Each structure stands twice: as C-alpha cells, then as structure tokens.
C-alpha cells in the first residue's frame, strides 16, 4: 500500500510543485485509525509490545494477564487482540492504532517536503469525535503528536444550526485546533447548507464565519461548493444546491467574502493570552470508553469535558486546551482537568506541584484512578492527588434519585448575582446527580455541594481545598443544572482572584458571546456575537475604537446594537 501511495504522491507533487497559486498541501482527509486490526497490524502490535516490554513477564504483570488465565508465555502465542476482556490490553492497542496514524501522516509529510517551496504550508484536516455532529476530542488520533509534522493545524467542524445553533462546538473544537500548534489554524471544512437539519437561518452563516475567525482560525472553507447528485453525501448540501443556482446561503457567503476583502487584514492571525486551560488526554478518553459512565457510553470523556468547556463558554471566559503530555502549567492561573482516568505518576505529581506553587486546579471524579496502562492504583483515591485535594473516597455508584444542593452561601450568592429570575420563588439551585457519584470524605477540604439523600447525606458531592500557595475544586459527580455549575465555578474563580474574564454580576452571558485577541497590528479586537434570534444591546467596555464592519467610531460606554444572529467587531 505505501509503495503505491508513494508513487501517487510523487506524481501529484511533480505535477503541482511549480504552480504559483498552490499555497499549501493538505496531507490526507480526516485520517483516523478506523479500527484497523488486520494480521499485519496485530503483528506490528506484538513487535511494539516486545520493544516496550523486553521481558514478557513484565508485560504480563503490568497488564494483569495472570488473572483469568490470560497469561501470554510466548510472544508467538499472542492471541487476537480484538474482543479481549482485558481493558488495559484493549486500551494499549488503541494507543498503538493512534500511533499508526501519526506515523502515516509524518511519512506523507516527509515526501511532500521534498517538493514544497519555503512559502508553502503543510496541513491536515483533523476532525472530532461525533454523535450527530462534532462534539470534542478525537479518540482515534493523538492530534498533538500527529500535528508535529505539519506547519499549520487544520480542522473540520460541523455543528447544529437554526434553532439548535449555540456556537459551543465552534469554540471547543476550534480551541483544540488552536492548541495543536499553539497557533492559528485553518477551518478546512465546515457546513454551508449541510445536512438537512442544519440549514442555517438568515444571518447564521455569517455569525458562524466570524465566530471561527474570532476563535483564532485564519480561514473558513465550506464542504462543499455544490451539492452532489449521487451516493452517501447527496444530502450533505454545499454552498450551491443541486441546481447550481444562487440561493440564500450563496448570497450570504458573498456578503462574508466582501466584508473580509475590506477588513480581513485586521482579522487574520488573532492571538490570545488566556488565563485558564482545559487538559485533554487520549488515554483517559479510551479509559472512559472501556469503563463507561452510566449513560454517556463512548462519549463519556467528552461529555465531562464539554460540561466544563460549555460552562466557560456561556460565562464568556475564554480558555485554551493543553495536552496531558505537558508538565509546566505555570502560564495559567487556573487549570481544569476533567476525567483524568489514566495518568502516569509524573503527571499527578506535576499537578500537585502546580497547586502547591500557587496554581488553582479544578478536577473531577475518576481522576488519578488508574495508571497509563489502566491498572487501578491500589492505594487511597484519588492517587497522589488526595493530599492536594484534601479529600478521599473508597466507594462510588451510579446516582438514582439523588439531588445535589449547595452547602456554601457564596455559591447561592454567585447565582443570585449572575442569573436573573423574575420569579424568585421558582429559583432553585437543586439539581439531580447523573452518570457517576463518589462518596467523598473531606479531610482538609471544605464541602461545596452535598448529596440530598438519606443514604449519602454525610458525603460531599464537591469540595474545595487550600494547598500550599494554591487551591483546588473537586467534583465527585455531574449534575444537570447549568446555573449551579456556573455558580460554583464563579464562586471558586472569585476566591482565587482570577483575572482571565469578567466575573462581575453584570457580565454578559450566553447567548451574547464576546471574544478578544490581538491582531497583526498589535491592536485589540473585541468580537460581539449574538447567538439569538432576538436583537440585543451591549455596552462596550474597553478602549475607544472603531467597529470595523460599519466603520463606526466606538467610545467606552457606548451601546452596540446587534440584530438577531448579529455581529460587531471593535478594533482598539
């Protein structure tokens, strides 16, 4: 296969390498492992294990294969890994499959580099885990490793539209993309008309396009130009419909293009300096697939991650993503580590050190539970982190008819300040626990939330702790009330003195989204994005500037009126 592929790549590169308007090269298309597990792949996996475990006894011990007579006494007797009942082995095979993607893309990039000019880039359209649309971190690729061979990261982001449009997927998947090279990225595919339920309302295509750029993308490219007439993507509609005629989507794309001809030089290469980050980990994602939550299935890891990322998004707190392979988190005031199910001790010690030296850590149930091979740590949970978190647990279950209530008055105060309820009698921060619950005993930690249930009322559902020069917030469960989660986060961030967002009681909240950054001219841009059909008026807080689209002067304190699905961009 590689031999034939190389012939094709070289012929193509010879054909286009001198064409002046070829600006870069996309290596492949949404390349993933796709469950590859043929005889050759399995033989390569055994070679990979031999390299990592020269002594087969060490391999058997690390993966617990003596249990249930799974022991492998000779590498030549290694069984078909598909269908194994040993989740550690299954997870290691997933890791190996991801490494094949990294090697394959790097192999292609090496060939392309023999031909490309210095002014041309190499990219790849990474996609994301999927339900009916892009939802979060990709399980079949280690995108941080795979992107090393590229000069710019690329992404395909698809999301709900019309009544279901929130912009959250544009942000979370865009933030993953921006984090891969710690730089701007390219949207190589996103929806025009898209799937039948996605047909955008007037104004939404433009709002989506500006949202991508506000997040740090340097492009918006649509899949695809015209709708196709046969086969599986016949109803994945492009800019043009099947009749090739102008339509509402096409005309709105023309508006976007004409605006960017005028102001694009002000928008490109937007840089951000966020003060909070969310950690991503492929091994934990796999772990949550092998040992799932109650209802989320294979999407459990991204469900927990999105619980936090979407809360930050609604609160207009911009955030970065970082890889779990990093060990220096000192550039961030606060670090969110969701569902770190699989973690080497080096990472847990780095998190402990981060807090001890003044960082503020937010983490969740099942973090620090198992090592890098999904072997459960045999001591107090959470392993290593129990001291910095100031708590421990030894039992957990799926919550049924278990309510969550605040313990601390500052959580209720944060909710009352930030969320307007015309009928105060209906205002409640009670919520239902879901997916997983740990029975937390606080040692030095202080309960923030508790379980309202006669069997569990003595246990904390969430707790905070002071440790060294920093602090921690731990969630032992999930719950369904967004306002409760946002209130807990706001209260904690207030206490830490967080400077990376507006935490005031009158701070704008979703559906009004605000994004900021520094452009190529060193000027600050402030994007106002209205994710609602209803018009809204927002007060501009910041230096005096110019609204770029309308060329209107803006003074601090001015009201900016946005129509339904409207956009404004102020340069200061």
Describe the function of each predicted region.
Residues 75-78, 106, 118, 147, ...:
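Carbohydrate-binding surfaces of carbohydrate-active enzymes
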Residues 1-163, 167-170:
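Polysaccharide-binding and catalytic clefts of secreted carbohydrate-active enzymes
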């Amino acid at each position: 296969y590689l031999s034939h592929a190389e012939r094709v790549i070289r012929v193509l590169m010879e054909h286009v390498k001198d064409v002046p308007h070829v600006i870069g090269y996309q290596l492949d298309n949404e390349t993933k492992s796709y469950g590859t597990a043929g005889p050759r792949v399995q033989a390569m996996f055994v070679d990979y294990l031999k390299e990592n475990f020269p002594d087969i006894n060490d391999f058997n011990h690390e993966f617990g294969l003596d249990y249930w007579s799974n022991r492998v006494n000779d590498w030549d007797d290694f069984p078909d890994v598909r269908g194994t009942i040993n989740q550690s082995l299954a997870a290691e095979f997933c890791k190996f499959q991801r490494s094949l993607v990294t090697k394959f893309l790097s192999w292609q990039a090496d060939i392309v580099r023999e031909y490309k000019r210095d002014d041309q880039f190499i990219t790849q359209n990474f996609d994301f885990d999927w339900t009916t649309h892009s939802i979060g971190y990709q399980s079949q690729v280690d995108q941080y490793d795979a992107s090393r061979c590229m000069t710019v990261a690329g992404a395909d982001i698809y999301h709900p539209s019309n009544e279901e449009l929130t912009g959250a997927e544009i942000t979370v998947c865009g933030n993953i993309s921006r984090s891969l090279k710690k730089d701007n990225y390219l949207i190589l595919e996103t929806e025009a008309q898209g799937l039948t339920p996605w047909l955008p309302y007037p104004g939404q295509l433009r709002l989506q396009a500006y949202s991508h750029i506000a997040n740090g993308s340097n492009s918006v490219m649509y899949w695809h130009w015209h709708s196709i007439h046969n086969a599986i993507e016949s109803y994945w509609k492009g800019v043009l419909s099947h009749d090739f005629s102008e339509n509402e989507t096409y005309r709105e794309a023309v508006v976007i293009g004409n605006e960017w001809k005028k102001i694009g030089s002000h928008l490109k290469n937007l840089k951000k300096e966020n003060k909070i980050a969310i950690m991503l980990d492929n091994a934990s994602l796999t772990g949550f697939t092998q040992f799932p939550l109650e209802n989320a299935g294979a999407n459990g890891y991204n469900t927990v991650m999105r619980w936090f990322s979407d809360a930050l998004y609604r609160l207009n707190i911009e955030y970065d993503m970082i890889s779990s392979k990093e060990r220096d988190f000192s550039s961030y005031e606060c670090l969110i580590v969701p569902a770190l199910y699989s973690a080497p001790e080096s990472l847990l010690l780095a998190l402990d050190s981060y807090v001890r030296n003044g960082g503020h850590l937010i983490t969740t149930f099942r973090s620090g539970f198992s090592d890098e091979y999904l072997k459960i740590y045999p001591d107090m949970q959470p392993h290593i982190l129990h001291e910095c978190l100031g708590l421990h647990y030894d039992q957990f279950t799926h919550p049924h008819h278990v309510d969550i209530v605040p313990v601390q008055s500052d959580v209720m105060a944060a909710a009352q300040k930030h969320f307007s309820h015309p009928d105060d009698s209906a205002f409640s921060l009670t919520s239902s626990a879901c997916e997983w619950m740990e029975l937390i005993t606080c040692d030095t930690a202080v309960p923030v939330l508790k379980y309202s249930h006669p069997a569990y009322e003595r246990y904390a559902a969430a707790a905070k702790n002071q440790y060294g020069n920093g602090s921690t917030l731990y969630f032992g469960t999930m719950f369904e009330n967004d306002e409760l989660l946002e209130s807990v986060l706001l209260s904690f961030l207030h206490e830490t003195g967080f400077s990376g967002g507006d935490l005031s009681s009158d701070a704008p909240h979703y559906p009004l989204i605000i994004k900021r950054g520094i452009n190529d001219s060193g000027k600050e841009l402030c994007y106002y994005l209205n994710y609602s059909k209803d018009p809204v008026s927002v007060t501009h807080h910041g230096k005096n500037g110019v609204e770029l689209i309308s060329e209107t002067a803006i003074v601090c304190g001015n009201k900016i009126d946005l129509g339904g699905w409207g956009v404004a961009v102020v340069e200061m």
